[in-house]
């Protein structure tokens, strides 16, 4: 991977700002997308026990945290060329025995959600920047529990 550019970081930041514009709505888009592709994922998130509820503060907090961590990963990539995930994240994901296909489902849901959030500002360049940031974030989590 080449260096993560200032423009790529700015693109990721702009998608984060769009997401923050309506966290409850975009949290629903995100988790609905996950459950459509992987219904069993419902068992991985305690706050999905009763379905996707936009008024559930745990649902919106988790989505906000994840999307924020992807944004932070873009900043780490720009500053350091690598992402270092928190060991606690590695531990949690290790306990749930997550595999690559599950990380892919989350990535696809994240992209779908942010595409909706940014609307006509969506570009291939934005998609690539988000994919790089997410992939490096996921790799950091996996490394933390390897």
UniProtKB/Swiss-Prot annotation:
Residues reported in the UniProt entry to bind O2: 62
Domain of life: Eukaryota
Subcellular location: Cytoplasm, Cytosol; Nucleus
Positions where Phosphoserine occurs in the chain: 46
Gene Ontology biological process terms in this record: nodulation
Record-listed Nitrated tyrosine modification sites: 26, 31, 134
Post-translational modification: Nitrated mainly at Tyr-31 and, to a lower extent, at Tyr-26 and Tyr-134, in effective nodules and particularly in hypoxic conditions; this mechanism may play a protective role in the symbiosis by buffering toxic peroxynitrite NO(2)(-). Nitration level decrease during nodule senescence. Phosphorylation at Ser-46 disrupts the molecular environment of its porphyrin ring oxygen binding pocket, thus leading to a reduced oxygen consumption and to the delivery of oxygen O(2) to symbiosomes.
GO cellular component: cytosol; nucleus
InterPro entries xref list: Globin, Globin-like_sf, Globin/Proto, Leghaemoglobin-like, Leghaemoglobin_Fe_BS
Tissue expression: Root nodules.
Keyword terms of this UniProt record: Cytoplasm, Heme, Iron, Metal-binding, Nitration, Nitrogen fixation, Nodulation, Nucleus, Oxygen transport, Phosphoprotein, Transport
Globin domain span: 3-146
One Gene Ontology molecular-function label: oxygen binding
Protein residues bound to heme b: 46, 93, 96
Similarity field: Belongs to the plant globin family.
Assembly and oligomerization: Monomer.
Function: Leghemoglobin that reversibly binds oxygen O(2) through a pentacoordinated heme iron. In root nodules, facilitates the diffusion of oxygen to the bacteroids while preventing the bacterial nitrogenase from being inactivated by buffering dioxygen, nitric oxide and carbon monoxide, and promoting the formation of reactive oxygen species (ROS, e.g. H(2)O(2)). This role is essential for symbiotic nitrogen fixation (SNF).
Protein name: Leghemoglobin
Taxonomic lineage: Eukaryota, Viridiplantae, Streptophyta, Embryophyta, Tracheophyta
């Amino acid at each position: 991977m080449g260096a993560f550019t200032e423009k790529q970081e700015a693109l990721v930041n702009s998608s984060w700002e769009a997401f923050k514009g309506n966290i409850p709505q975009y949290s629903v888009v995100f988790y609905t997308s996950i459950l459509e592709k992987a219904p069993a994922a419902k068992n991985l998130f305690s706050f999905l026990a009763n379905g996707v509820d936009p008024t559930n503060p745990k649902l919106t907090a988790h989505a906000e945290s994840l999307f924020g961590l992807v944004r932070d990963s873009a900043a780490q990539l720009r500053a350091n060329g690598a992402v270092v995930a928190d060991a606690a994240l590695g531990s949690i994901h290790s306990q749930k025995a997550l595999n690559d296909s599950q990380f892919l489902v989350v990535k696809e849901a994240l992209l779908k959600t942010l595409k909706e959030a940014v609307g006509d500002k969506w570009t291939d360049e934005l998609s690539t920047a988000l994919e790089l940031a997410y992939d490096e974030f996921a790799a950091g989590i996996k490394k933390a529990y390897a």
